[in-house]
Amino acid sequence: MDPLNATGMDAFTAIHLNASWSADSGYSLAAIASIAALVSFLILFTVVGNILVVIAVLTSRALKAPQNLFLVSLATADILVATLVMPFSLANELMGYWYFGKVWCGIYLALDVLFCTSSIVHLCAISLDRYWSVTQAVEYNLKRTPKRVKCIIVIVWLISAFISSPPLLSIDSNNYISSQPQCMLNDDTWYILSSSMASFFAPCLIMILVYIRIYQVAKTRTRSMSGKEPRPDGVTQTENGLNKANSPCHGDRENGHCQCPPTPSQRTVTIGQQTDDADMDESFSSEGKGHKPQRQDSQRAKRPGLKKSSISKQSARISRVSNKSVDLFASRRKRRRSSIAEKKVSQAREKRFTFVLAVVMGVFVVCWFPFFFSYSLHAVCRDYCKIPDTLFKFFWIGYCNSSLNPAIYTIFNRDFRRAFQKILCKSWKKSF
């Protein structure tokens, strides 16, 4: 009888079954209790952390970018690992045999391969998305709509399902001959090598090569931008953002001042002056341009009131035109500065996102490489090299990876950190 159905049995029988269970698994009762507690905490942490990731992306404005849907799908895969794979792996590990039947064994193995493959294919798709966003920034950002990202996610899951389908057809039936059946993948060399290559090594190689290329492109752009930043000696920037060296003074100097080409606002004022002069029958002249005939002076002397009112009207018109020009120039400069600031914020966010994903990919490779390496080594030299059975426990390190992504987002990304704090504070306030 299974220990799980020990309800109503006397204490002696329960202790006896626990002792036999301990003997089958090779663990002591204390070790079984410790492992069960540790893995249970890992499952809970994985589920809660990845649910927070999903809620954060779907509710936070700072995380509304379409590419973050990849993280939602990746978090979903990690949640499914924690709920549909890890509990049965824990039971199989502690009991020492597979209790749940042959049919569920095939489904369990297929789901295990599916979610592992899905995680790395997601990371591969994310690396390609990063590469295209870096090399084809304008064109690709216009194409990268939520609908397009969702289509890519569906393709990722279909590829993962295709790779993970063989376990349903290739379960080793010899594992069920003994009284204590084992749930293991097909042990044939061809299957081990092909599944390892398709599920891990090939996507991992693509991912690493793409990120190396992203690093090279980013480094080249940084060098080119740093080469453009230095200004020539003697060049200063005026308040309106124009370089003095780019607007040289020319012509003769008058009264110690240099005659420079008029700025747009100055041109507008000049036009207003010309219009007013025409309205006043050219009664005014610029300073230093000579004198009009004496007859005009006598006419102006006869009309002092007209002269004062005309001067005030002209000054008002010039002031209005000048103010409009200054306001227009200031608004354009403000819009230009705001667009530049938005662009810098967007670029900084893209850089942070790329760095975080690089950390996620690196941690994934570190967690899963030991298992796939030992698994493939067993297929290649099973007759010549003895691999300890403990090496096949490395898949637990791979399972731990499912719980690490939320922690990585929290540590390395400010937007995720703020979103998590907001979600937790809201739930904390609602609970009181």
Swiss-Prot record:
Keyword Nucleotide-binding: no
Membrane topology note: Multi-pass membrane protein
Glycosylation site positions: 5, 18
SS bond partners: 105-183
Record keywords: Cell membrane, Disulfide bond, G-protein coupled receptor, Glycoprotein, Membrane, Receptor, Transducer, Transmembrane, Transmembrane helix
Extracellular side: 1-32, 96-105, 173-188, 381-393
Residues in compartment: Cytoplasmic: 58-69, 129-149, 213-356, 414-432
InterPro entries named among the record's database cross-references: ADR_fam, ADRA2C_rcpt, GPCR_Rhodpsn, GPCR_Rhodpsn_7TM
Composition skew (Basic and acidic residues), residue ranges: 288-300
Any one cellular-component term (Gene Ontology): plasma membrane
Subcellular location: Cell membrane
Gene Ontology molecular function, alphabetical: alpha2-adrenergic receptor activity; epinephrine binding
Tagged with keyword Transmembrane helix: yes
A Pfam family per the record: 7tm_1
Described function: Alpha-2 adrenergic receptors mediate the catecholamine-induced inhibition of adenylate cyclase through the action of G proteins.
Family the UniProt entry places it in: Belongs to the G-protein coupled receptor 1 family.
Entry protein name: Alpha-2 adrenergic receptor
Species the sequence originates in: Labrus ossifagus
